Curated annotation (Swiss-Prot):
The lineage of its organism: Eukaryota, Metazoa, Chordata, Craniata, Vertebrata. It comes from Homo sapiens. One of its GO terms (cellular component) is endoplasmic reticulum membrane. It is an enzyme of class 1 (oxidoreductase). This is Flavin-containing monooxygenase 3. Belongs to the FMO family.
């Protein structure tokens, strides 16, 4: 057998890692704290310590064609944006199809991962686990950390003077499950992220009054984009990424703001970000603008202080008679089973080469899978990360020197600050990142060659959605069905909506989509050229 690999967590990152290890002839053992797979997507009625937690009404923000495993499309009849139960159903089907369950030890908690005494030469790890009160230790050749980054809630109570005097209920959004207990209540939601907006709009149907407090604002996008197509199938494209990264900054910024304001003017709704040109991940919510218009949700600035029954905002206004405060303030990054010397942090930034490998170890035998965030979906990202990591562990891929890795990290971090802002330390440019990882393992599609040999496919790959299938077209792990999956992705996207057929299916024309978006800039450039 190949090298023994410990995998911590059986969510989508863990399952992708098991599968990638098997593809490379490695011997995986996955440790899962709970009694089931799915991680974040496995709903539970109560938030469990040390596990990700979601509320009952969670739907995906990525559409099914953009968030699947690259060789395992969602069923045709699944909706484009899915309830968490549908995604869990898909995850279970994937695990069974790829025969992954037998490699998982359930109800097993990883208490510590330490360097083996001869780590400098072998790269091995001592992994200690607990099950039914019994501790066991084993030596592994490598470790893949797949425990996610939505586990440990960030609850900055010290940032809110007077909160200790507040007499109502106060808790983090991970403990929120459903709206029933808030009937007739006055609720303040702190934080304008996806969870905060979802919870606020859901509560607005039953609560007496709901307010959202936001320190810096946010762009709010709809899942439904031009002509009713899923947003990511129109916006997450190679051509769009090329334009975004090569247009003059002023034009790129103008187009970005115009695109974000296409549905409604954020200034009018109190949602406008403090720095609107930063490419921070937007919030996806189809109901918030209507809730604000109807007066059942109000947006307020940051909370200056709390009293026993109210919140005083920085603009001097007061929300009185509050029954409950829900902090949708994100999560902290933590790996309590690892020594801090293994995965280092700097200014609240986890230092990882390409978001995967700690750069300062003698041997690169530990990888963090799933510790990035972008406009792209998690599943295809962790699939590529784990494939690369498995090849590095096997020895078929090599990493640069420590110095080169640190230089790359510093350079990328500076770009991230300029592009996404100081607080978005795990944000990344999806297609650029995916191309980078796929190039390491020989799986990056060769676009010029495709235009010469298969122009029909090339047009869809370059101008159409950058779907996960593209990264199983060539190289190790190549999937024979990838070409057909790309050419039929719009059929699968439109299929679940055809419950009342009224005419021929209309697929988008990307030429007119991009022409519409760039019509004004093209006209301005033309006028400038004529005048000069």
């Amino acid at each position: 057998m190949g090298k023994k690999v410990a995998i911590i967590g059986a969510g989508v990152s863990g399952l992708a890692s098991i599968r990638s290890c098997l593809e490379e002839g490695l011997e995986p053992t996955c440790f899962e704290k709970s009694n089931d797979i799915g991680g974040l997507w496995k709903f539970s009625d109560h938030a469990e310590e040390g596990r990700a937690s979601i509320y009952k009404s969670v739907f995906s923000n990525s559409s099914k064609e953009m968030m699947c495993f690259p060789d395992f499309p969602f069923p045709d009849d699944f909706p484009n944006f899915m309830h968490n139960s549908k995604i869990q159903e898909y995850i279970i089907a994937f695990a069974k199809e790829k025969n992954l369950l037998k490699y998982i030890q359930f109800k097993t908690f990883v208490s510590s991962v330490n360097k083996h005494p001869d780590f400098a030469t072998t790269g091995q790890w001592d992994v200690t686990t607990e099950r039914d009160g019994k501790k066991e230790s084993a030596v592994f050749d490598a470790v893949m950390v797949c425990s996610g980054h939505h586990v440990y809630p960030n609850l900055p109570k010290e940032s809110f003077p007077g909160l200790n005097h507040f007499k109502g209920k106060c808790f983090h959004s991970r403990d929120y499950k459903e709206p029933g207990v808030f009937n007739g209540k006055r609720v303040l939601v702190v934080g304008l992220g996806n969870s905060g907006c979802d919870i606020a709009t859901e509560l607005s149907r039953t609560a007496e009054q709901v307010m959202i407090s936001s320190r810096s604002g946010s762009w709010v996008m709809s899942r439904v984009w031009d002509n009713g197509y899923p947003w990511d199938m129109l916006l997450v494209t190679r051509f769009g990424t090329f334009l975004k990264n090569n247009l003059p900054t002023a034009i790129s910024d103008w187009l970005y703001v115009k695109q974000m304001n296409a549905r409604f003017k954020h200034e009018n709704y109190g949602l406008m970000p403090l720095n609107g040109v930063l490419r921070k991940e937007p919030v996806f919510n189809d109901e918030l603008p209507a809730s604000i218009l109807c007066g059942i949700v109000s947006v307020k600035p940051n909370v200056k202080e709390f009293t026993e029954t109210s919140a005083i905002f920085e603009d001097g206004t007061i929300f009185e008679g509050i029954d409950c405060v829900i902090f949708a303030t994100g999560y902290s990054f933590a790996y309590p089973f690892l020594d801090e010397s293994i995965i280092k942090s700097r200014n609240n930034e986890i230092i990882l080469f390409k978001g995967v490998f700690p750069p300062l170890l003698e041997k690169s035998t530990i990888a963090v899978i799933g510790f990035v965030q972008s406009l792209g979906a998690a599943i295809p990202t962790v699939d590529l990360q784990s494939r690369w990591a498995a090849q590095v562990i096997k020895g078929t891929c090599t990493l640069p020197s420590m110095e080169d890795m640190m230089n790359d990290i510093n350079e990328k971090m500076e770009k991230k600050r300029k592009w996404f802002g100081k607080s978005e330390t795990i944000q990344t440019d999806y297609i650029v990142y995916m191309d980078e990882l796929s190039s390491f393992i020989g799986a990056k599609p060769n676009i010029p060659w495709l235009f010469l040999t298969d122009p029909k496919l090339a047009m869809e790959v370059y101008f159409g959605p950058c779907s996960p299938y593209q990264f199983r077209l060539v190289g190790p792990g190549q999937w024979p069905g990838a070409r057909n999956a790309i050419l039929t992705q719009w059929d699968r996207s439109l299929k679940p909506m055809q419950t009342r057929v009224v005419g021929r299916l209309q697929k988008p024309c990307f030429f007119f989509h991009w022409l519409k978006l760039f019509a004004i800039p093209i006209l301005l450039i033309a006028v400038f050229l004529v005048l000069t």
